[in-house]
Amino acid sequence: MDPFSKSPDDDDLRPEAEAARRPQPQPQPREWRFAQVFGERAAGEDVQEVDIISAIEFDKSGDHLATGDRGGRVVLFERTDSRDSASRSELERQDYPIARHPEFRYKTEFQSHEPEFDYLKSLEIEEKINKIKWCQTANNALFLLSTNDKTIKYWKVQERKVKRISVMNLNTSQSSGNGTTSSSSSSSSRAILPNGGCSEKLYNFPNNDLLFPPGGCTSLRLPVVVTGQDLNLVPRCRRVYSHAHDYHINSISNNSDGETYISADDLRINLWNLEISNQSFNIVDVKPANMEDLTEVITCAEFHPTHCNTLAYSSSKGSIRLIDLRQSALCDNHAKLFEEHEAPGSRSFFTEIIASVSDIKFARDGRHILSRDYMTLKLWDINMDSGPVATFQVHEYLRPKLCDLYENDSIFDKFECCLSGDGLRVATGSYSNLFRVFGCTPGSAEATTLEASRNPMRRQVANPTRPARTLTSLTRAVRRGGENPGVDANGNSYDLSTKLLHLAWHPTENSIACAAANSLYMYYA
């Protein structure tokens, strides 16, 4: 044998190969802490229906947060803390970095949608905001899309300096002709106009009868408009995209090209250009020729985070389809189909109902898709369509109660899901204002239950010592958390009327914003 020839086993002796064989250390479970709350409800206070939050979304930088409510309003928050507030010398003296949570403050709000009535179909159109999506910023202005059941709007929010009129022909502070003294108010009164515009009245006169001084005005002066130093946030509706959906819009998603976006209803997905509001292209149509043959509907759709030609949409049958826009103008055929096959003999009346996917999210790297159905979270690898790589039980204690949940329609609740920016954890909501955080790295046993309150760990569930697994050669799926029987996962009574449907994960930090009725809670780890 040639002494200089390389043995096949030489690679096994290398340090890199040895390190690859060692089990990788698991990330430690995070300790979640309360950060902030906006709109906290007092004990016994009734919540108005229009104030209930219906959508939450961080922008890509994580410096802005938007919420929408059932009253058609959009509220914007901005980050106030400095990410790098500590100096380099201070950081060098520390043994470990101090966890700082992002702090937000109220920025502005505007009326996005108003209630409407479709006279052709005799249907009321709610003003409720279904989804909010941030668009690319430009010229220090914020851009976002908001939608209700039928209409999508494109908003621009920008700071502008307040302009005031400084020279007037009439001085309302002087005595009027009838001997009475009229007072002027320097405070401006603002009225919200349709599409979020604002009218600002700089002078409030006590009555509509302005009396000229005796002898009249000796001269007339042109009013002078002066731009002050005060800044005022002005929301403006740039585009309105309407009359493109016969059914309720359930999702919108921006494309990575920054120019287009999709909107999806129960049967169709349309492709829009942000600058063209009177034309859209139908790219997915699942409506059969005979509606009696309809077997599934579209529940959610989302663009790939980096590939502008790829998008995924989910269905009420629990499947996720990946489509490539380059294949054809109308994407009747999918590139990949992700679905979990039923175990033999496990089908029941509720099987298809609880399998319906209520939300999907792409991981930041675009490699994985997270989906939420009624009972579970599933993590899918887009390169492996044989089954999910991990399944997380959210509230398994409700499975014996499916009949009761069907009777009160709770089984049709649509919970959202989210992933951390590093892809190591996933989160979703449940009942009793609880939400769950799972570690999704292989072998992780992290399964934390938190409550949307000032004390999130009050109803903490003891984590199992090791995850319950079902390992197969085809799916390599992992099932974790929530296997304990009882009233709920911790033996506490659950409340189906308080449910945490909407939440969002900060794109770069371990921070979660979630909605409990009209309150916005924020937590960090």
Curated annotation (Swiss-Prot):
<dbReference type="InterPro" id="IPR000009">
    <property type="entry name" value="PP2A_PR55"/>
</dbReference>
<feature type="region of interest" description="Disordered">
    <location>
        <begin position="1"/>
        <end position="31"/>
    </location>
</feature>
<dbReference type="InterPro" id="IPR018067">
    <property type="entry name" value="PP2A_PR55_CS"/>
</dbReference>
<feature type="region of interest" description="Disordered">
    <location>
        <begin position="169"/>
        <end position="191"/>
    </location>
</feature>
<feature type="repeat" description="WD 1">
    <location>
        <begin position="48"/>
        <end position="87"/>
    </location>
</feature>
<dbReference type="Pfam" id="PF00400">
    <property type="entry name" value="WD40"/>
</dbReference>
<comment type="similarity">
    <text>Belongs to the phosphatase 2A regulatory subunit B family.</text>
</comment>
<feature type="repeat" description="WD 5">
    <location>
        <begin position="352"/>
        <end position="390"/>
    </location>
</feature>
<feature type="repeat" description="WD 6">
    <location>
        <begin position="495"/>
        <end position="525"/>
    </location>
</feature>
<protein>
    <recommendedName>
        <fullName>Serine/threonine protein phosphatase 2A 55 kDa regulatory subunit B beta isoform</fullName>
    </recommendedName>
</protein>
<feature type="repeat" description="WD 3">
    <location>
        <begin position="244"/>
        <end position="282"/>
    </location>
</feature>
<dbReference type="InterPro" id="IPR015943">
    <property type="entry name" value="WD40/YVTN_repeat-like_dom_sf"/>
</dbReference>
<dbReference type="GO" id="GO:0000159">
    <property type="term" value="C:protein phosphatase type 2A complex"/>
</dbReference>
<keyword id="KW-0853">WD repeat</keyword>
<feature type="compositionally biased region" description="Low complexity">
    <location>
        <begin position="171"/>
        <end position="189"/>
    </location>
</feature>
<feature type="repeat" description="WD 2">
    <location>
        <begin position="124"/>
        <end position="165"/>
    </location>
</feature>
<keyword id="KW-0677">Repeat</keyword>
<dbReference type="InterPro" id="IPR001680">
    <property type="entry name" value="WD40_rpt"/>
</dbReference>
<comment type="subunit">
    <text>PP2A consists of a common heteromeric enzyme, composed of a catalytic subunit (subunits C), a constant regulatory subunit (subunit A), and a variety of regulatory subunits such as subunits B (the R2/B/PR55/B55, R3/B''/PR72/PR130/PR59 and R5/B'/B56 families).</text>
</comment>
<dbReference type="GO" id="GO:0019888">
    <property type="term" value="F:protein phosphatase regulator activity"/>
</dbReference>
<dbReference type="InterPro" id="IPR036322">
    <property type="entry name" value="WD40_repeat_dom_sf"/>
</dbReference>
<feature type="repeat" description="WD 4">
    <location>
        <begin position="293"/>
        <end position="333"/>
    </location>
</feature>
<comment type="function">
    <text>The B regulatory subunit may modulate substrate selectivity and catalytic activity, and may also direct the localization of the catalytic enzyme to a particular subcellular compartment.</text>
</comment>
